[in-house]
Each structure stands twice: as C-alpha cells, then as structure tokens.
Amino acid sequence: MTQNWRPQSRLQTMTFAGTARPMTSMTAAGFTKNPLATAGVASIFDKLPPEPPKDSPEQKADQMEINIFKLLRDGMSAASCKDYVTALGRIREAIKLEQKVSQHRTMNGLADSINLDLRTCIWMHWAQIQALGGQPEMALSTYEKIVKTAEGATLAQIRFNMGNINHNLGKYNEALKNFRMAIDQASPSLPRFRQKIASHMAQSCIKLHRWQDAVDRIEEYLIKQYTLASSVGTDVERQNFYAMTTRFDPLYTVLIGYYALGVPEKMIDAYSRLIDSSILISDHPDSLEIDDHHNGISSKQIAMADAELCNMSNDDELDDLSRYNATLRHEHTNKLLISARLLAPAIAWEESQGYAKLSDILREKGHHGISLQVQMSMALTLLKRNEFEKATDIMLRIDREGLESALALGINVPLSILQKTRNLSLTAAATAVTNQESDLHLLGIDPSVLANQQSVVDRDAVASRGAPEVDMLKTDDDNGTKKQPYAAFVPRGVHTNIAFIYYLKGDYEASARHAQIALEIDPYDSFAHINLGCTYSKTNQWELSLREFLKAQEINMESVQATYNAGLVYFKQQEYKTAYSCFQKVASKLPSYGDAIYMSADCLARMSQIDEAIQMLSNLVTMFSAVKAYDPSIYIRLGELYSIAGDEGQAAHYFKEAHRLVPFSLAVINWLGSHYIKNELYEQARVCFEKASRVDTTTPKWSLAVAACLRKSKQYRDAIYEYKHILKRFPTNTTAMTHLISSLNNIGQHKEADEWAEKLTKLTNNKVPEVTEDRELDEFVKQERRNSVAAVGPGSRAGQDRFEASNNRVSSNTGDLFGDVDIAEELLTEN
C-alpha cells in the first residue's frame, strides 16, 4: 500500500555543505554572531568586491562631461542676461572640452561610448546664442553642419530653429521649407511641438499674403490631432492627449485668416470653435460647486466664473498654478473680446447686428458674462459715433440683465442698489424684495421699520430735486471697502460710462446717482470717483469734489485724470503751491501734455515767480513748434507775463503771434491797440480797432477808438466822418457827440459845431438814456453770436479760459495779476 504524499513542513531554504544538518539545540537558546561559521560555511555577503580605481578612464570622462554641462549652464545664464560675449566664451570652452573628452575616450579604447548627442547639444547652444547675438547667418551655417548627423526629435528641433531664423530674416519661402521638414520629423507624441511648428508655418504664409494656405495648414493640423486623439484607446489617455494639445491659439490665427479672406460664415464658425476651446471656468474656491445630478460643472459655477472674468478680479490670493490658470483665462477672454470687435463690422451690414450675433453665440454656450462684455463693446462703439441715447439704452439693459442674473442665482442685492437703478423688471425686483424680507424675519427685524425709514429718505430725495441746487452727498456704506458678490454680474464700467454720458448732457443729478451706484458695485473704480468728483465740481461742491479725486488717486496712483482734476480744484481754492505739485506730477508722467505745463506756469505766475513761469511757457512753445502745433493762448499768456516783467518788446511780439493765429480775439486786439497808443503809433492802433469793430458790432466802443486814433493823428475830417457814422447807429451816444463838436471846432466849422452842441444840450437836459446798442442790428447776428458761444464746450477749456484771463489788464494789486480795466479806453480818454 502506497503512502499518500504530503507537503513538507519546512521550506528548506537554508542548506549546508558537508555532513552538517540542522538539529534541535540541546542547550539554552542564545544569539549566535555567525551561525554559518560554526557550521564551517562562509557567507557570501561577508566581503564586498574590490573598489575600482579612482582614476579610471570612465570616471575621468564622466567628470569632464559634468564640467561641460556646467559650462553650458553658465553660458545660457549669461545669454539670458543678454551678455552674449560671455555666453559664447563659455560655449567655446565647452566645445574644446568635448573634443578632449572624445580624444580621451579614443585613446583609452572607449570610442564606442563617445556621446554624440552631447556634441550636437553643444553646437545647438552655440548656434542659438549666435542667433540671439545678432549673427543669424553664422547660426544658419552652424545648423547646416550639425543637421547632417542629427536625427529624430533633435533633427526636427534644428529644422524648426532654422525656419525661425529664416523667418526673421524675411526669407519666408526658406522658412516654410524648414518648417515642413521639421513637422515631418516631429513625433506624433509631441503634439505641442507640432502645434508650434504649424503655427509658425501659418505665420510665414501670412507674411507672404497666402491667407488660404495659412488657414489650411492649421486646419490640417487640427484634423490630424483630432484623428490621433480619437485613435487613442482609453478615455484617460484621450483626455491627456487633449490636455497636451492647445487649440485656442491656432484657432485664433484661423479666425484672423478667415477675416482677411472675408468669409462671414467661416468667421462665425471659427469664433464658435474659439469659444469651445477657451479656458473660461474659474478655479476660485468660492465659485467651485459640482452638480451631483449632472456629474459636471453647475450653471452657478459657470456664471460666477464668467462674472469673475468680466471684472478681471485680483488674483493675489491664488497660488502659482491657479494664478497661471487665471492669467490664461484672462488672456482668452481678452482675445474673445478683441475678436468680437474685429468681426462685428464684417459679419453683418450694421456693426450693432454683428455684435448682437456674437453676443447670442456666447449666451447660447453658457457664457452670459462675456456676452454682456461684448454688448459693452457695442455701446462703446455707439459712443464713438456720438449715438448717446442708443449707447445708454444698451448699458442700462446690460445692468438689468446682470442684476437679474444675480437675483436668479439667489445672490443678495441691497435694496439701495435696486432702488437706484430703476432698471429691473418688476418680477425680479419683487422676488428680490420678498427674499430680503424673509431674511429680515429670520434675523428678528421688522421690515416695516426699514420701509418707513426708507419712505422718509424718498420724500427727502423728492424734496431735494425741487431745490435750485442739488446737494449730492455720498453716504459712505459700511460695505464700501469690499467688493460685493453681486458686483461680479455687472460688467465693469457700465454705470461709470452712463454717469459720464449724463455728465455731458448736463444732468448732474443722474450722473451723480450712477457714479454712486458704480462705487457701490465696485468701490475701487477710480473712474467712477473721477466722474463723481467732476459732477460735484459742476455744482460748486469743491470739498466733495476734491475728496473724490484724492480717493481716485489712492486707488490708482497712476491716474493722471485724478491728479490733474485735483490740481484744478486746488487752483480754484487758490492753493497754488499744492496745485503746482499736482500739475508737475502729471507733466512728469506725460511730458507732452501741454495743459499740465500751462497750468504749472500759471501757478508760478500766481505765486509771483514770473521768470520761472516765462521759462516754462517758452519751453512749451518750443515743444509745440517742433510738431508744428501752435496754441494762441500760450502766446497770450507769455505776452502778459512779459508785460508784467516790463519787457514790452517781447510782450508785443507774442501778442502779434497770437493775433496772427486768432485775428478775431478782442482781448488780443485790445492789448495791441493800447500798446500802439502808448507808443503813439496811432495808425497801427486804428487798424487794430477797425478789425475789432468788424468783429464786435454791438457796441460803439471800437468805432470810438478808431475815431480817437484819427483825432490823435490830426486827421479831423476822417474823425468827423467816423463820429457821424457812429451817431447814425447810436444817435444818443454823448461821447461821440462831444468829440464831434471838438473836431468841428478844430477845423473851423463852428456853425455846425454849434448845431451839434445844441443837440447835446437838449439831450443832456432831457436826460435821455444813452443807447449803447445798434438799433439796426439784425436778430440773425445775435443768434450767430449765441451759437458761437454755445459751440465752445468743456473740451475748449484751454482756449476759452485763457482768453478770459487775458481779457483783463494787470493792476497794481499783486494779489490779482490780471486786472479788469480797459487799457485802450484809459489812454484814449481826453481830459
């Protein structure tokens, strides 16, 4: 009977040589240092193999290669600092050291281990630094030498570099040839590199004005990438392949190509594909909310992401990777908006219809916030065309849609915003009020108390509108220092632009209201502060205006508008030193901004620093003359300052220059006429006053000055004719009648003089009021004068204000450098 087989009870992993075999110990158990030695067997781990010699040929070669890599690193570091001489020196040392390594390996029988890839790498660095250092031809010759031994990805990289050099040299056909060779050698496992090659091929085709070829190259590349992605086996590998493929930039180039070809259907299709390939989902923690029912990103996350993109919020709280993602999203959003501005006039007969189409595409794809930004671009386009009403309607619609989206997502919008906008639909507003009242009940607050308080505020607001001057005080909100959640749904600048439009219309109450809404939505909007400050200045609330300008400066230290406007307020308050500092800051940032330099000189003049003011204005004249631009107001102010300094010759020179540019300026004519009279040049003075009489026909002042010049030059008969002409138009002018009598007596016509003296006596005894206006003046002339005054708007501040300032003479009072006494009238008055 055979015995059944059973497995062994021990593994028998320990074997012994000889006759020794494991036995049960008959002594006490203890630690044995070397159990095998007791059995007469030596362990194979007792001794290590002998250490190789330290100065072996392999170790020397390896150390020399390490030194080569150090030289390469130092050379490229120097090249990054644009120190190309040092970089070439390091690479030259690396080349020599590599030659020594090759000789060392050959002499020691190690020729098979020569590192050819290292040699190619060194020469590629050498050629790259030559190209960066302005030696493209030498770089090409270097690449031609190493391209013969290169293969695979290295060969593709060399051909790509050669194509870039030829492209920069303007050899676009050669560049295309090298790019084609590069893309043939590039492995399909390098999708980003292949994409870069295809993009550069398209750029070369664009330079050759071969737009269709450029589009075909990119479209062909995209089709190949889609085919490769579809051929990948698993979903994970397919997703990884898509992640390695950047489709946005190629599609952006395709869109521009179709725009150049003028194919509207292709433009719209490319824009739709560009939206699909863009990265527009935010990774901000507050906006991440996964919808469990749909296994994807919720609509609230998309809305929050689009809102964040539209407002371009600060990314300081993000880590480096998230900041890079945010930067990429911002770049994609900006390019989408630029594409919309580019395509809108080309895809429809009217530009507004093009914007509407693109906005609808964005809205259909779920990007509501960016569609509002596109509508904002349409509104800005209408503003450039001076279609203010249409632009205002569009921006109000944008505001309504943004706030309604916020309310639909359950985001709390304060009642103050809802009441100030007056722009929401009744359903959305009622829903918002109901939700907020329920929140108040949960907090134990009676909504009726707040409603009563609000009704009092409304009554006060209605009463204030009836006042002659609106007191638009801005109440500081406790939440004014932080951006509110609902602010992300209103594109930045909507209410700021609306406030600006109402400011131009002269509706300062509406302008202030929208500026305040803009600040409640975004307290860090410097332009809203500037608009509000300008509105306050129009209602003579200078302290409030200055406060807003200073806030705008705190938010944006580079805001020249806020600094300049603050300087104007300081100038109005006669704080000339502070105003001068503000204007100088603007001039330092914008050296060619003439208004800042002019106002700086004006501040110096007000501080009695006449020489410095003259020097500054002279520099301004030189700067304008270099570009053949001339401002008569600068010449006028220079003439006034030279007159204050006592240099009448220079003053007359600059007033003549101003008169050459603006011959209709009565202020300039008045000064020149008075200057000629003081120097007894009555004929030149008469010519000036005759020009003034043709400009201003509503007063006999200038005709009297002409007649007085004739009397001063002893031309009594011509003076008599002029006085009679004046009395035909102004029969009750006693001044003309008195001088007429005097002139008649001077030429011996006493009888006629007595007749005029009798008329003067009757006129004086009857106390008939003197008529200073021309009775025959046509109503058309008055209307033309009113139109000419109305045509001078806020944009003409430089010319208008300076003419008004120069309309007066200098008085003896040092506090007011420009008085209000007529120089010519004083000089021509007879004792």
UniProtKB/Swiss-Prot annotation:
Which is an annotated GO molecular function term of this record? kinesin binding
Q: Where are the TPR repeats?
A: 68-101, 120-153, 156-189, 248-281, 492-525, 526-559, 560-593, 595-627, 632-665, 666-699, 700-733
Gene Ontology CC terms, in alphabetical order: 9+2 motile cilium; axoneme; centriole; ciliary basal body; ciliary base; ciliary pocket collar; ciliary tip; intraciliary transport particle B
Q: Does the keyword Oxidoreductase apply?
A: no
Q: Which SUPFAM superfamilies match?
A: TPR-like (SSF48452)
Q: Which spans does this entry mark as compositional bias, Polar residues?
A: 805-815
Instruction: Report the domain of life of the source organism.
Output: Eukaryota
Q: Which UniProt keywords apply?
A: Cell projection, Cilium, Cilium biogenesis/degradation, Cytoplasm, Cytoskeleton, Flagellum, Repeat, TPR repeat
Q: Which GO terms describe its biological process?
A: cilium assembly; intraciliary transport involved in cilium assembly
Region Disordered: start-end pairs: 785-816
Which InterPro entries did the record assign? TPR-like_helical_dom_sf (IPR011990), TPR_rpt (IPR019734)
Q: Which Pfam families match?
A: TPR_6, TPR_8
Its localization reads: Cell projection, Cilium, Flagellum; Cytoplasm, Cytoskeleton, Flagellum axoneme; Cytoplasm, Cytoskeleton, Flagellum basal body
Q: What does this protein do?
A: Component of the intraflagellar transport complex B (IFT-B) involved in flagellar assembly.
Name recorded for this polypeptide: Intraflagellar transport protein 88
